[in-house]
């Protein structure tokens, strides 16, 4: 989605620490019209992030909100769905293709055994799959322009949003380490180990 295709203004919104400004400037260099940072040093759970985004979105009233399907830290896959419920927006998840047609969006999503295409009314929340789009490279002139553009930074504490976490992290455990592999000298040795040790053949 880029402004040159006549799809309206593109706003980049992010919840995070002050160093998140780097990602916002990258978005500006790639063609976003505005960038908004809801700034906090706290580690927020999906519900809190959805509340913050809801507050920002209510002020802007966009017709389409696009999010990643899940964060790489918690891997929760919850924020988009919670946000759609809070705003009473249509929603579609795991989108690999999105086509906008006036007041509707046609969304193709990968499911077990094939592809599913659904039609949702706008405004809508869509979470994306990696296959939706291949990011473009920003040109050097646009990178330099983005450095001079003003960012809209809003401390979360001033937004009147309850960001208290409702979840308690009890533990994080690494998976069991795999046994180191061995090399065998011959096919006979391999067959013997598969029979006697692995017991996968008889």
What are these regions (language model features)?
Residues 9-202:
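N-terminal glycine-rich FAD/FM-binding segment characteristic of electron-transfer flavoproteins
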Residues 1-11:
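Single conserved hydrophobic/aromatic residue that forms the stacking wall/gate
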């Amino acid at each position: 989605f880029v402004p040159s295709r006549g799809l309206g203004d593109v706003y980049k919104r992010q919840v995070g620490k002050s160093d998140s400004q780097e990602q916002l400037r990258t978005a500006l260099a790639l063609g976003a019209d505005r960038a908004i940072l809801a700034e906090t040093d706290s580690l927020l759970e999906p519900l809190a992030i959805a509340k913050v985004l809801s507050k920002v979105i209510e002020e802007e009233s966009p017709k389409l909100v696009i999010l990643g399907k899940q964060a790489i830290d918690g891997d929760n896959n919850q924020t988009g769905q919670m946000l759609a419920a809070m705003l009473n927006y249509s929603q579609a998840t795991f989108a690999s293709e999105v086509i906008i047609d006036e007041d509707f969006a046609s969304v193709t999503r990968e499911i077990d055994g094939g592809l599913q295409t659904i039609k949702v009314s706008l405004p809508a929340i869509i979470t994306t799959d990696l296959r939706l789009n291949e990011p473009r490279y920003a040109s050097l002139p646009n990178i330099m322009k983005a450095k001079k553009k003003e960012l809209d930074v809003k401390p979360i504490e001033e937004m009147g949003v309850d960001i208290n976490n409702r979840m308690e992290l009890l533990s994080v455990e690494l998976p069991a380490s795999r046994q180191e592999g061995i090399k065998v000298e011959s096919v006979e040795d391999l067959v013997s180990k598969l029979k006697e040790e692995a017991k996968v053949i008889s």
